[in-house]
Amino acid sequence: SLEGGESLIPALDSIFENAALKGVKEFVVGMAHRGRLNTLSNIFGKPAKEIFSEFVGKDYEEQIFDGDVKYHLGWTSKRKSDSGINVYINLAPNPSHLESVGPVVQGITRAKQDKYHKQNIEKVLPVIIHGDAAIAGQGVVYEVVQMERLKGFKTGGTIHIVVNNQVGFTTNYIDGRSSTYCTDVGKANLCPILHVNADDAEAVVHASNFALEYRMRYKRDVFIDLLGYRKYGHNEGDEPRFTQPKLYK
């Protein structure tokens, strides 16, 4: 669940609404499991009926095609902004391998920019949502960050949002990284990193607007570190009081 980091939703909403005013036509989003269903419902407009049907399992027209868990499935929709502008938003499918969706998002974004928008990097905006443990622990994040300014791979800057709940499954953050901040990987390219209290929704929206302005003006990556908490366990089967008894007291 997203409880403890719910401000991700107004952050995404603010980015999409304001980016549409700046001429962005498409958004490509990559994220893992945390908050995915919430995002699908509240940002992408996926019908609740569709989401709940995936909890009990459903048949597909293609008999040779097997389903996937609800936290892996992608979605594409057309969204009308508050200003009346139609934009297309795509949530890339992802596996259980955290952060591996990052380069996929970059590839989809670059392909759309090249094929449909005459290489105009301002028309397609990539947004990657990370977990604090994964962004610090998965080497693919560094690889993607290093692609930021390479001629063959650049997409005009990515907005990285970290849902920082200060715990990775059962690992305390002090046992999961050597750096001070989980977003320190962004310092490799001198990317601006905004640390914001996830409980302060207005501050989160302000940081999101700043990040968008920076990306659109300088065509560079920017990071937002939403410092919050995880109200419940890692998933439906995890009881966090066993492994973090003091934190969940």
Predicted regions and their residues:
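Conserved internal helical-beta-strand scaffold that buttresses enzyme catalytic cores
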Residues: 1-141, 145-159, 164-174, 178, ...
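Glycine/aspartate-rich loop-and-adjacent alpha/beta segment that forms the canonical ThDP
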Residues: 47, 217-249
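Conserved thiamine diphosphate
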Residues: 86, 181-207
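Acidic, metal-coordinating catalytic cores used for nucleic-acid/nucleotide bond scission
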Residues: 135, 201-204, 230
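Hydrophobic/aromatic ligand-binding patch that stacks against planar heteroaromatic rings
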Residues: 150, 185, 214
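Short, ordered loop/turn segments at secondary-structure junctions
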Residues: 163-166, 198-199, 227-229
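Acidic, Ser/Thr-rich peripheral helices and adjacent loops at domain boundaries
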Residues: 175-183, 187, 244-249
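Functional cores that coordinate and move charged inorganic groups
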Residues: 194, 202, 208-212, 216-217, ...
